[in-house]
């Protein structure tokens, strides 16, 4: 899987194994990888100019989800709630969150299960374009290091598509002076319930970068495709 189809380490691996039975999921049908892999699936994310990939991240997960459902002979019913959640995010996004995050010295995302994966996505995007030190942790790891870093200049963003344990973790942070935010879907459910939260955390990163005067499309020191190992 490659958004650009030009990533150097993936190209090196393809050249080494010379796959005859392989599938490429990409957002570029004119890349080098398409010359070496026989089966190609388009993400249909549309052109993505920004260095920090957002649309292609979301679309790649949707492609995998749809493939798995097809292999199992099941209907991808969760997609309906996924779309509903995206519509809710458009209507309910809180612009005060980026304003508060922009004042912080460090930020942590917390989540469990699929939400933990999205916590890593949220942390990466905030680091990439807002330049704020940010990490994504599982809720079970809160007391294994990250809690020691909490101060009144720290923010913790909890992601919960279906996990009630998160509330107690956020209370631990609040008791130590940290700022807490809680993000929850209106329509919870599985992988796509968590994936819809990725849109929210990506918007937080985008508007935090804008709040700090950064160019969210062209972050410093980063390139769209890693073409040199």
Segments the model singles out, each with a brief description of its role:
Residues 1-229:
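A SIS-like phosphosugar-recognition module
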């Amino acid at each position: 899987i490659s958004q650009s189809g030009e990533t150097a380490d993936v190209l090196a691996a393809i050249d080494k194994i010379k796959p005859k039975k392989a599938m490429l999921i990409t957002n570029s049908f004119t890349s080098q990888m398409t010359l070496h892999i026989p089966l190609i699936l388009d993400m249909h994310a549309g052109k993505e100019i920004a260095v920090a990939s957002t649309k292609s991240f979301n679309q790649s997960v949707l492609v995998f989800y749809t493939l798995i459902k097809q292999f199992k002979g099941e209907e991808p019913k969760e997609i309906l709630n996924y779309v509903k959640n995206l519509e809710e995010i458009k209507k309910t996004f809180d612009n005060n969150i980026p304003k508060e995050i922009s004042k912080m010295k460090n930020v942590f995302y917390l989540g469990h299960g699929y939400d933990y994966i999205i916590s890593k996505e949220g942390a990466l995007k905030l680091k990439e374009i807002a330049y704020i030190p940010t990490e994504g942790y599982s809720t079970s790891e809160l007391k294994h290091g990250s809690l020691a870093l909490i101060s009144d200049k720290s923010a913790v963003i909890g992601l919960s598509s279906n996990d009630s344990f998160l509330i107690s973790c956020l209370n631990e942070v609040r008791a130590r002076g940290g700022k807490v935010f809680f993000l929850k879907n209106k329509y919870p459910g599985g992988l796509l319930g968590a994936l819809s939260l990725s849109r929210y955390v990506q918007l937080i990163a985008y508007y935090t970068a804008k709040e700090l005067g950064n160019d969210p499309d062209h972050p410093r020191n980063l390139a769209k495709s890693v073409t040199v190992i």
